[in-house]
């Protein structure tokens, strides 16, 4: 007896056989598994950064406007420390400092012609606590991982009779952690 097989059926049989054969060749059989633990670690070190904004006093008049009242201004110091870090922010005496100590420096601005305008920076709004260059006279902080703003309070004492001009100074602000 002769069986009839059309070409379409034959093609489907061949394609099916090839597909099954290639699938069988690409499949691997595994007998068992093994495991291991991979330890992953990192060390986070304390870190801090600091940024400052300028302190601009404006016009000072030791004869009339500031004859009996100090001229005051504020600025900010922004610190960011890793969470849990402890740090202290200190300020040096400035470029043109007079006599004094690191704890209570005599800060001065100059016009560049040998003339000086005495000023001071403080860590409190009452302007009683000088912001100095030592740990006890600096400002202590606890890191949170987020920026923290610290206000700086400045004062130019009254009745300084000095030549007119533009006076300036630079204070180095340091964060130690």
Model-identified regions with their sequence ranges:
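Bacterial N-terminal signal peptides
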Residues: 15-24
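Bacterial N-terminal signal peptides that target proteins for export
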Residues: 2-16
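Solvent-exposed strand-loop boundary residues in beta-sheet-rich modules
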Residues: 113, 125-127
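Short beta-strand and strand-turn-strand segments in soluble, beta-rich domains
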Residues: 129-135
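N-terminal signal peptide c-region/cleavage motif recognized by signal peptidases
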Residues: 26-28
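Predominantly extracellular/luminal cell-surface or secreted proteins
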Residues: 92-94, 120-124
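N-terminal small/polar-rich segments of proteins
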Residues: 30-111, 137-177
């Amino acid at each position: 007896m002769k069986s009839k097989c059309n070409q379409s059926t034959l093609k489907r049989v061949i394609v099916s056989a090839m597909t099954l054969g290639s699938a069988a060749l690409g499949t691997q059989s595994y007998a068992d598994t093994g495991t291991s633990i991979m330890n992953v670690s990192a060390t986070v070190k304390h870190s801090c950064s600091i940024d400052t904004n300028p302190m601009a006093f404006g016009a000072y008049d030791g004869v009339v406007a500031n004859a009996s009242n100090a001229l005051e201004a504020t600025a900010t110091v922004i610190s960011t420390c890793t969470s849990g870090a402890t740090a202290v922010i200190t300020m040096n005496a400035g470029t043109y400092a007079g006599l004094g100590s690191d704890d209570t420096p005599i800060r001065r601005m100059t016009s560049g012609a040998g003339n000086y305008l005495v000023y001071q920076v403080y860590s409190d709004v009452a302007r009683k606590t000088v912001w100095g260059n030592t740990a006890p006279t600096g400002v202590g902080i606890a890191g949170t991982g987020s920026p923290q703003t610290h206000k700086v309070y400045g004062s130019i004492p009254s009745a300084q009779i000095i030549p007119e001009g533009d006076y300036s100074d630079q204070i180095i602000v340091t964060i130690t952690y």
